[in-house]
């Protein structure tokens, strides 16, 4: 339904303004000058509400606001526009009128993207619902954005233009000068000595690599090369060459590789020319006129020769500071922050949550188990607290106070004291009085517990009298009850009831708990008796008065039984003075006054009164000696008996007061009996003897304390020994002392709460506790745990409601300290014990035992609950992991101490013990840390499969089960992540170790150089120096592997070794520091507790003969010289027992004397660290000496040379200062000579190195020539590995006839048919997809294409319910537009505001969702392909087509370099490889988490396992493919399609063969002429050796002679290639290599043929994309495509199948592309130079690599071919020389500006051409001043002109052809090649950026709920 949009006119336009004024007004507005606008209005007084008119119909009709908003930003910026708008608005200009296209100012403001202008309009109530003529709302405009110029950085040029550089013509003078310099080097003693010293130092280089990885790798390579030869039994033979062809190639590569390595590693820049020029900043010769100092212009070198010492001092200080100023963050932070934080997190988030769940509102995880344990403990605590009361209760439940026989005895004794003798009926079965206590415990209790019997046994120990009543403990109860139940006149002291509560007001009784149950009975009394203020005695007296128990027999009082009548007069029915007949107080006077009360009354007397009254009421009779019936009841049954007695008799019911009084008496008596029994037991317990029986009682009755609680709460199973410590060793003493006695708040609370617990449950728990009387011993607490765990399942019906009770749970939490009291809390408060902190502390201090198997068995058998199992098992798992982390922490603390020792030794200048003792200990401790890390990882990894064992036994429906399992899963993930961090930081310790080695080697080098520099002769002495280099340890595996990688560590430690090294100590070395570090003075045993000084390897005789310690110090501190070094491995390491690592063989000798060496023998190997600087210093010193010598010594030859140099040249630049020119030439020539000499020395050094290795290995003796010290294969070096394509046969024939080494230049180097060019659509050009250039990016960091600025804030402000869903004339909503702009931010904003991506459709019936699907699917199809080539062909083909079309130029006769179309596809592959490498090496904000996530995605979708470097480039599985690419390595294979190539060595070999034949013939003659057997034997050996050499030469000749080959690549060649590929994969461990370094290193291991390289690239292009794991972008796009297919929305089907895992994968991919986006955008945000923009530098390096791969070989051959043909066409050349190759060789060897033609084409030209054609240079690059492309290539012409054989002038045909045709062709080729490489990179990056934006939108869409 359409919405009517009325036009609202707020300000009517002015109608009467003159046209000219109106036109001028709008013109003034369009100036953007607010002052002019104001002045115009002031002058013309015009109105503001006018409309701009046009002479044409339907003019614009724009308001002034329109005019302002349409101003170009260059005329008025946004601030100016706003100022003008505000002014116009203030003056009345209409702000809400449309123009003729219905465009409103709000539309223009939205398009202008200025937030302030939008805010101003909205503030002025401008409607945002306006539509233009195409129905676009302002929101449409805002989403579309503002097109802006794409960003391009301003380039700053040089103010001063570049100056011309003079060029010196070279001629014979230079040759003479060079010869003179050579003579000077040979004859001048000082210069010669320095030169010999320098050369011999170079020759010592192999010794500098002794025992290093480099040497070991070299040995391995040699073994690989020679294995086949040495194992060949037929060697030497005629087939020798065939069997060695592969090895020959490998050895060639090896020699070259070692040469390159040494140059890069040790001799950086040594053989590079020095920058020698006038007005330099360094050294210059001293002349007679310079007054001892060179003038500024005479300074020809960049630096003074002694600059090196400042440089070395700085380097030394840097190395030292790196060690002593080390930031110990890697270890300190680990031990003080990282690991403690991890352990705290484990405590808080896992252990505490599992056990206590302190923050849970309800019981979760394992808290119910904790609450259950606390319940059991509290019940048992209650049992222990109440055992004595309970025992008393049971005694009173089972015993009468006295039996009838006992009562009779009392009566018969006239109620006097009991006779304590055998006459008493002992152990009367029914009487408490008179029963032996121990027998009572054994025989009378029901129920009876083990503790009762234990107590009985102890009683018998204390009082063995069990057959009579005595004074012992067994008679205690009888003895203490006697005073209660005897005559009040008892001389033993009867108890007097008058002294107790019975003689106080009855109301006082109610405060006593035992009486409270009788309180309500007072209401049943008759009113006269309800006065609670009278005493029990008074109420009894009153009752007797009422009853008047007058016992009369006939008319006579029954004196014997009537105890109530006193005297014989008027009866007074009173409380009798005594109930006992015949008492002295009974009868006639002189007794007490009639009617008074006696002051003594016993329990026995009271009961007899009560019984007498009952008798009287019921029968009217009294038997004064009758056994009271209540005594016939068990003591605790008295109250029920009395109730029953009175309730069953109507007569008694008349006197409820009697019942009431009787019950009070009964209760009072029960209390007295209870007190007696309790007191007797207490007496026993206070006096327990020392005996096992007594200990059992103690254990049982000892109160529970906090130690019990912690034992049970700790995960199973704490080591019981930890709880049985005593004295000062007892760390739990405070817990044991905190008893659960009545003063404990929790216990006190529970004594009340227990009354709410079912008695049945309590009784069952009591039965558990009494099953084994020894369970409560601290050493047996595990039994208590077992009781709890095994019973809680059966008792769950009782337990569950208790622990779910909030009062119970909160009370426990209060005790734990986890209850948060509300501010207004009025409930019970329980003192907090802060249980959790102490609990966590105990975890650290206590050992635990592994009980998983036991628990699993119990779970299977149903003996424990699943929750118990999970809580205990996971609790142990968490705790065990934490304790293992604690071990790591402790080890890191030791490492910190070791590092401190290193620093202390360095500061003390005590160097010997650092590598000898401390560094191996550091490595050992590192191994300990790694072992512990792997131990944790092993625990984590094993726990997952363990879960399978119990998974089926756990009920998933119980929430706590799932909570604990999920908590465990999270724990595993968390700890694994933390272990990676710990491991990574730990491995940094190796870097520190190697920094220390670096410093020690630097120190030795510094000592040597300083000594050499200060020495006056050739005998050099120094001290405190190692005579050889210490070897750093290889880096351990950089990432934490899934399995313990101890084998790799073992490999590292095997190489952790030294050669034989001696330390030369200073006799004044201060060794005081050693006393503290090594604890000297006590027995030398362990260093820092980490490693024993005992060695397990070769006997060191340290510190004394036959001793084998690693330390040369005796216990008294004496340092011993140990003269014999031991080479070998530092540490003995056992994979199965890594913690047992010990010192092994390596031992550095210690000698207290100076180190001496002869300077002429070169520097010792320990100069290694400063070798580059030192050799550069020596080189400059020699140059200085040569120049200075010639300046100072003008002998005849020198003067002649000097004069010739002075006259050399025709330019005038230096005519006024000819001496400077001479200095420069002499310096440059000397530099050139030294460079060549040093290069020769380096190669000789490498050859000697290889010879020494092979000569010392018996396996290679048969291929060694000991006379000439050469190796056969080295002598067989063949450099003619040439590639033949089409051939200029005439030229080739000419070349072959002269044995030219330059055959390749005769081959056709251009593609004669462009249709043959690969990777192009030249004959079928498809339309290029231009949207690559037109993607609408919000970023301003792009140079080309259309760039748009979109302000999300403005978009948000222009959204309302109408604009959000408004359609324009195309039916597109703002969301359609945002998607078409591929702007994820705007898409997200619109969706958050409620935009519907499914409902609204445009005129093409597309919803926004449809549109997005179409866009992303079309986009992803662009790089879809099943091969590498197919995945990128949509990029390289269009650009190759452009390249070819631009190269096909008539000016260059349509010549196109062969293989030039390989450049772009290879660059696109390299781009993929580059980001693969960035991801693997975490560059440009890539992280290990992102890398691991991408790896998991590739593993899931493609089953790809990534490697760090793109080694998939070299993985060729099919031998057929391998054979094809290897054919280029064999000249004979190329001969099949060309002509035979002859090696220039053929004639040399023929000469050698002739010489060998001559030697053999003459030696044979000599042998015939001698009879000396020894001489004959010697000659035979020589002949045999010569024959072997002859065989080799014949083989060489045979190889070089033309044959039609019968085979190409054999299996050995294929095997060799595969071996090389394996070598790449296995040996490239240096993570610092960039992509180009990797290619150079990897290709270098395979071969040196450019054809081979191209074939490898070609085969990779045809590789299945799934086998090209480094093609990261196409592979990721396949994954994205898969995810797109999971989210569908069309007319027929709507579904979203994307899982949570898919969404996580998509998030990873978006994050990856976001990081790539930042990289691409940063290219332009960084400075536009190679020094400050590493991205541009890498792009530069890529293009240089491609130039050298594709252009350089061909360009070189074209150039040489042109030179050759030019010489061939010259009659003068044919006349002067017979062999044109001599001229070519001379041209190639000629140097211009220090570079030969070859070095310029390969090393200079690629870099220079890329810089020039991209206009990107370094900051100080002088090449930036080159003004024409011809200047870039000019050195080629200049080099050709410099040859000494043929004078080539600028007018010669050769030079003209080069200048006019060849060089322009080169320029065109290089320029277009470079430009289109850059263009392809740019396009590919645009595609990647669009991929990011579309993928981000996909991520947003994936989270939408698609409506059904």
Swiss-Prot record:
ANK repeats: 20-50, 60-97, 101-130, 134-167, 1370-1399
Gene3D superfamilies hit by this protein: Ankyrin repeat-containing domain
Annotated Pfam families: Ank (PF00023), Ank_4 (PF13637)
GO cellular component: virion component
Chain segments annotated as coiled-coil in the UniProt record: 1539-1603
Protein name: Putative ankyrin repeat protein L484
Domain of life of the source: Viruses
Keywords assigned by UniProt, alphabetized: ANK repeat, Coiled coil, Repeat, Virion
Keyword Repeat part of the UniProt annotation: yes
Subcellular location: Virion
InterPro entries: Ankyrin_rpt (IPR002110), Ankyrin_rpt-contain_sf (IPR036770)
Keyword Coiled coil: yes
């Amino acid at each position: 339904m359409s919405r009517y949009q009325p036009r609202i006119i707020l300000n009517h336009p002015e109608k009467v303004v003159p046209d000219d004024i109106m036109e001028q007004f709008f013109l003034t507005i369009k100036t953007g000058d607010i002052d002019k606008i104001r002045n115009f209005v002031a002058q013309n007084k015009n109105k503001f509400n006018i409309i701009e008119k046009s002479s044409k119909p339907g003019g614009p009709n724009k308001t002034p606001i329109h005019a302002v908003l349409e101003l170009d930003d260059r005329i008025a910026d946004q601030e100016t526009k706003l100022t003008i708008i505000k002014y116009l608005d203030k003056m009345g200009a209409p702000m809400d009128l449309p123009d003729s296209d219905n465009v409103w100012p709000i539309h223009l403001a939205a398009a202008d993207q200025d937030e302030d202008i939008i805010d101003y309009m909205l503030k002025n109530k401008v409607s945002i619902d306006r539509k233009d003529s195409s129905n676009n709302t302002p929101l449409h405009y805002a989403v579309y954005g503002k097109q802006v110029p794409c960003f391009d950085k301003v380039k700053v040029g040089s103010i001063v233009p570049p100056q011309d550089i003079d060029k010196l013509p070279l001629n014979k003078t230079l040759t003479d000068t060079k010869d003179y310099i050579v003579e000077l080097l040979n004859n001048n003693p000082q210069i010669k000595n320095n030169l010999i010293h320098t050369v011999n130092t170079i020759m010592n280089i192999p010794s500098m690599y002794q025992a290093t990885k480099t040497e070991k790798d070299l040995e391995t390579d040699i073994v690989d090369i020679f294995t086949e030869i040495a194992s060949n039994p037929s060697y030497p033979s005629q087939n020798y060459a065939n069997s060695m062809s592969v090895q020959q190639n490998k050895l060639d590569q090896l020699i070259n590789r070692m040469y390159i390595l040494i140059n890069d590693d040790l001799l950086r820049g040594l053989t590079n020319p020095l920058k020698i020029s006038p007005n330099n900043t360094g050294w210059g010769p001293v002349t007679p006129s310079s007054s001892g100092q060179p003038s500024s212009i005479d300074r020809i070198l960049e630096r003074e020769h002694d600059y090196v010492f400042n440089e070395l001092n700085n380097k030394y200080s840097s190395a030292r500071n790196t060690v002593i100023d080390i930031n110990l963050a890697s270890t300190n932070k680990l031990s003080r922050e990282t690991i403690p934080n991890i352990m705290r997190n484990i405590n808080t988030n896992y252990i505490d949550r599992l056990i206590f769940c302190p923050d849970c509102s309800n019981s979760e995880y394992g808290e119910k188990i904790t609450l259950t344990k606390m319940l059991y403990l509290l019940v048992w605590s209650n049992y222990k607290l109440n055992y004595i009361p309970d025992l008393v209760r049971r005694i009173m439940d089972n015993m009468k106070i006295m039996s009838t026989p006992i009562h009779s005895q009392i009566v018969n004794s006239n109620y006097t004291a009991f006779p304590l003798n055998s006459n008493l009926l002992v152990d009367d079965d029914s009487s408490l009085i008179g029963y032996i206590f121990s027998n009572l415990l054994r025989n009378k209790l029901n129920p009876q517990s083990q503790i009762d019997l234990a107590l009985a046994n102890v009683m018998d120990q204390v009082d063995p009298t069990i057959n009579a009543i005595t004074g012992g403990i067994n008679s205690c109860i009888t003895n203490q009850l006697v005073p209660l139940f005897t005559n009040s006149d008892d001389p033993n002291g009867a108890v007097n009831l008058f002294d107790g509560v019975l003689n106080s007001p009855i109301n006082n009784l109610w405060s006593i708990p035992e009486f409270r149950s009788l309180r309500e009975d007072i209401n049943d009394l008759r009113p006269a008796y309800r006065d609670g203020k009278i005493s029990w005695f008074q109420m009894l007296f009153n009752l007797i008065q009422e009853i008047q128990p007058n016992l009369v027999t006939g008319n006579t009082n029954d004196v014997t039984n009537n105890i109530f009548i006193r005297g014989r007069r008027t009866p007074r029915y009173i409380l009798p003075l005594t109930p006992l007949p015949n008492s002295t107080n009974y009868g006639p006077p002189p007794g007490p006054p009639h009617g008074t009360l006696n002051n003594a009354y016993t329990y026995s007397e009271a009961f007899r009164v009560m019984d007498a009254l009952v008798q009287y009421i019921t029968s009217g009779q009294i038997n004064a000696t009758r056994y009271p019936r209540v005594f016939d009841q068990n003591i605790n049954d008295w109250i029920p008996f009395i109730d029953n007695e009175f309730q069953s008799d109507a007569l008694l019911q008349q006197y409820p007061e009697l019942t009431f009084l009787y019950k009070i008496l009964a209760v009072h008596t029960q209390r007295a009996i209870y007190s007696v029994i309790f007191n007797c037991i207490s007496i026993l317990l206070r006096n327990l003897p020392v005996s096992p029986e007594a200990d059992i009682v103690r254990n049982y009755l000892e109160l529970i304390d906090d130690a019990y609680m912690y034992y049970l709460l700790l995960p199973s199973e704490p080591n019981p020994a930890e709880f049985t410590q005593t004295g000062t060793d007892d760390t739990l003493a405070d817990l044991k002392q905190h008893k659960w006695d009545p003063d404990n708040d929790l216990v006190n609370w529970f004594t009340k709460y227990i009354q709410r617990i079912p008695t049945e449950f309590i009784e069952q728990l009591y039965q558990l506790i009494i099953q084994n009387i020894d369970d409560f011993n601290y050493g047996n607490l595990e039994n208590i745990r077992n009781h709890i765990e095994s019973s809680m399942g059966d008792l769950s019906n009782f337990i569950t409601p208790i622990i779910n009770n909030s009062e119970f749970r909160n009370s426990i939490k209060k005790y734990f300290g986890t209850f948060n009291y509300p501010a207004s809390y009025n409930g019970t408060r329980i003192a907090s014990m802060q249980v959790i902190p102490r609990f966590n502390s105990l975890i650290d201090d206590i050992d635990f035992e592994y009980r998983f198997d036991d628990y699993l068995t119990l779970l299977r058998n149903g003996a424990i609950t699943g929750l118990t199992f999970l809580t205990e098992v996971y609790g142990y798992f968490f705790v065990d992991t934490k304790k293992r982390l604690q071990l790591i922490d402790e080890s890191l603390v030791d490492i910190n101490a070791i590092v401190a020792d290193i620093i202390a030794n360095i500061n003390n200048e005590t160097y010997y013990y650092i590598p000898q003792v401390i560094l191996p200990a550091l490595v050992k401790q590192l191994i300990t840390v790694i072992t512990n890390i792997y131990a944790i990882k092993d625990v984590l990894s094993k726990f997952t499969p363990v879960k399978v064992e119990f998974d089926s036994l756990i009920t998933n429906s119980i929430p706590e089960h799932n909570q604990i399992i999920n908590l465990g899963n999270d724990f595993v993930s968390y700890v694994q992540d933390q272990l990676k961090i710990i491991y990574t930081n730990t491995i940094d310790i190796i870097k520190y170790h190697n920094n220390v080695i670096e410093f020690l080697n630097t120190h030795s080098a510094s000592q040597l150089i300083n000594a050499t520099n200060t020495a006056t002769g050739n005998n050099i002495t120094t001290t405190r120096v190692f005579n050889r280099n210490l070897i750093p340890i290889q880096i351990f595996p950089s990432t934490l592997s899934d399995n313990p990688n101890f084998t790799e560590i073992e490999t590292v430690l095997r190489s952790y070794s030294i050669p034989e090294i001696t330390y030369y100590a200073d006799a004044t070395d201060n060794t005081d520091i050693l006393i503290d570090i090594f604890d000297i003075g006590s027995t030398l045993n362990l260093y820092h507790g980490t490693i024993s000084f005992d060695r397990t390897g070769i006997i060191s005789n340290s510190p004394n003969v036959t001793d084998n310690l690693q330390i040369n110090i005796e216990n008294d501190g004496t340092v011993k010289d140990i003269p014999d070094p031991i080479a070998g491995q530092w540490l003995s390491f056992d994979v199965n027992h890594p913690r047992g690592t010990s010192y092994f063989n390596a031992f550095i000798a210690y000698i207290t004397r100076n180190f001496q060496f002869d300077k002429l023998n070169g520097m010792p190997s320990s100069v290694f660290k400063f070798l580059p600087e030192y050799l550069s210093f020596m080189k400059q010193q020699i140059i200085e000496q040569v120049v200075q010598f010639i300046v100072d010594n003008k002998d005849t030859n020198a003067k002649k040379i000097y004069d010739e140099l002075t006259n050399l040249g025709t330019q005038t630049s230096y005519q006024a200062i000819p001496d400077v020119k001479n200095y420069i030439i002499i310096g440059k020539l000397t530099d050139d000579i030294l460079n060549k000499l040093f290069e020769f020395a380096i190669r000789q050094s490498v050859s000697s190195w290889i010879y020494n290795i092979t000569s010392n290995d018996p396996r290679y003796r048969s291929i060694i020539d000991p006379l000439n010290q050469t190796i056969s294969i080295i002598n067989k070096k063949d450099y003619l590995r040439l590639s033949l394509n089409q051939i200029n046969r005439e030229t080739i024939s000419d070349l072959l006839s002269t044995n030219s080494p330059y055959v390749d230049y005769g081959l056709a180097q251009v593609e004669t048919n462009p249709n043959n060019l690969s990777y192009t659509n030249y004959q079928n050009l498809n339309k290029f997809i231009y949207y690559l250039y037109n993607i609408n990016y919000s970023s301003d960091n792009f140079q080309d294409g259309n760039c748009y600025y979109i302000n999300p804030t403005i978009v948000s402000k222009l959204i309302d319910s109408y604009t959000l869903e408004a359609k324009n004339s195309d039916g597109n909503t703002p969301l359609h537009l945002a998607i078409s702009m591929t702007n994820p931010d705007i898409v997200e904003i619109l969706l958050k505001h409620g935009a519907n991506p499914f409902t609204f459709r445009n005129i093409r019936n597309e919803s926004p969702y449809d549109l997005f699907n179409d866009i992303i699917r079309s986009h992803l199809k662009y790089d879809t392909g099943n091969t590498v080539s197919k995945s990128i062909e949509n990029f390289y083909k269009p650009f190759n087509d452009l390249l070819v079309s631009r190269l096909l130029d008539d000016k260059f006769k349509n010549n196109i370099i062969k293989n030039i179309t390989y450049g772009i596809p290879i660059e696109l592959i390299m781009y993929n490889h580059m980001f693969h490498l960035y991801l693997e090496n975490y560059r440009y904000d890539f992280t290990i988490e992102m890398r691991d996530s991408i790896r998991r995605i590739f593993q899931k979708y493609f089953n790809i396992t990534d490697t760090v470097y793109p080694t998939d480039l070299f993985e060729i599985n099919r031998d057929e493919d391998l054979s094809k690419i290897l054919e280029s390595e064999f000249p004979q294979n190329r001969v099949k399609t060309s002509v035979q190539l002859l090696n220039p060595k053929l004639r040399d070999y023929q000469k050698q063969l002739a010489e060998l034949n001559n030697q053999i013939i003459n030696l044979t003659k000599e042998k015939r002429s001698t009879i000396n057997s020894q001489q004959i034997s010697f000659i035979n050996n020589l002949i045999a050796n010569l024959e072997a050499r002859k065989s080799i030469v014949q083989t060489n000749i045979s190889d070089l002679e033309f044959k039609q080959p019968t085979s190409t690549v054999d299996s050995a060649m294929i095997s060799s290639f595969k071996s090389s590929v394996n070598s790449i994969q296995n040996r490239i461990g240096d993570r610092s290599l960039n992509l180009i370094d990797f290619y150079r290193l990897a290709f270098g291991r395979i071969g040196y043929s450019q054809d081979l390289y191209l074939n490898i690239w070609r085969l990779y292009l045809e590789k299945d994309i799934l086998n090209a794991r480094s093609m990261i972008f196409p592979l990721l796009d396949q994954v994205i495509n898969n995810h797109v297919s999971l989210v569908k929305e069309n007319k027929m089907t709507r579904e979203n199948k994307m899982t949570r895992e898919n969404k996580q994968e998509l998030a990873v991919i978006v994050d990856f592309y976001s990081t790539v986006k930042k990289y691409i955008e940063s290219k332009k945000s960084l400075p536009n130079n190679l020094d400050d923009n590493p991205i541009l530098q890498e792009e530069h390096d890529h293009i240089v690599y491609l130039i050298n791969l594709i252009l350089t070989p061909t360009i070189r051959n074209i150039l040489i071919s042109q030179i050759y043909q030019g010489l061939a066409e010259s009659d003068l050349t044919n006349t002067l020389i017979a062999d044109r190759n001599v001229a070519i060789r001379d041209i190639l060897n000629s140097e211009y500006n220090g570079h030969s033609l070859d070095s310029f084409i390969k090393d200079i030209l690629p870099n220079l051409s890329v810089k020039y054609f991209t206009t990107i240079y370094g900051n100080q690059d002088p090449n930036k001043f080159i003004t024409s492309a011809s200047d870039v290539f000019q050195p080629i012409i200049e080099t050709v002109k410099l040859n000494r054989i043929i004078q080539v002038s600028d007018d010669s045909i050769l030079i003209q052809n080069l200048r006019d045709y060849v060089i322009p062709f080169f320029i065109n080729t290089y320029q277009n090649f470079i430009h289109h490489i850059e263009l392809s990179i740019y396009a590919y990056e645009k595609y990647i950026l669009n991929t990011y934006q579309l993928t981000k939108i996909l991520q947003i869409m994936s989270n939408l709920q698609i409506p059904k």
